[in-house]
């Protein structure tokens, strides 16, 4: 990214960001209304505004009046369950109140649909009357048992706030260059398709000269059938947050951004809950653990 684009992108900042404005606009505005004003304010083209609004499921103008969305991910479609599911929802809510979206992350269960900020799947459609009334239902869970003994994803080293605090305290006493050296020698790679060495990435970022640095966690599982980090996001949110905090410490960044689509409400709930508790305990925000290191998360 060029220095000019970086400057333009950070001109207004995260607290008043374009995506938030688009979300507000999708609720309160008519199709196409206000595009020029937003484009001028954020110094982007009108086509960029339109492209973003038409790309994201919850921002699309044609979806504003919808009450439910049927998953059209590849697994659900191949299972052949969605046509009848959509018909049942339309009978209950009305033909014009049911839309479609990709993918809700229930590829193992099918019959997946989204209603009023929650995802449902499997036999949940049989409880549609209770769901529409707002009654709390007991959802069937897919239970698995792990016999792993060495996997960081499965262990309990960051299973609660106290362990988070103790481990963070230890890391903040380490020299940043030593953490990078350890990462480089570990051969740890990113979780993306490129498998880029984490140590190299953090090293480059720590040496980059910039007035402001951000730590970005792209938790979007945009490809149909690719909600591969669901366990990590829903059951191990502290590990995701811990990695971002340590990254901020090492590279000299004081602000992080977690990007998750609205299609995954359980992940959003788990991460928001953890972030709020960490802020209450002083483990996110200004002068963490009485040090000169500050890091906030959005």
Regions picked out by a protein language model, each given a short descriptive name:
Residues 1-298:
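Feature of Fe-S/electron-transfer and energy-metabolism proteins
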